[in-house]
Amino acid sequence: MEKYQLYILRLEDAKIIPSKMWFDDIYTAMEYCVLKNRAQVELNVEQYYYFYFLNTSYFDNDDQIQDELGDRIRFIINEEEKLSYRLRSLRSKSLEVLDNKKQGELI
């Protein structure tokens, strides 16, 4: 039975770090990776990310691994942009509310 080791790609310097976590089930392992990657998007709005992935024969060759990593990294960057946009939007709405409140106090 194949086991799946969790790896972490530090995007700041493209260093791959093997973790001590192993999974017996690929679906549990992939779900864990998705959740960890999603948490990175939500928590580190303006910081570099760690990207979680597995060692697995699920990928036939290095090109497939690179393609998959590239797709996932693009997904994370896209999610970051969406989150940043939402935060900027909330920030501008908050400033607008504060500005309206100050103007109301002046009247």
Q: Which role fits each region the language model picked out?
A:
Residues D24-L43:
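A short, charged, amphipathic alpha-helix used as a generic interaction element across diverse proteins
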Residues M1-I17:
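Short aromatic-glycine-(Arg/Gly/Cys) micro-motifs in beta-strand/loop hairpins
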Residues P18, R38-I107:
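Short, mixed-charge low-complexity intrinsically disordered segments
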Residues K15-Y27:
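A short, exposed loop/beta-hairpin motif centered on an aromatic-Gly-Thr core
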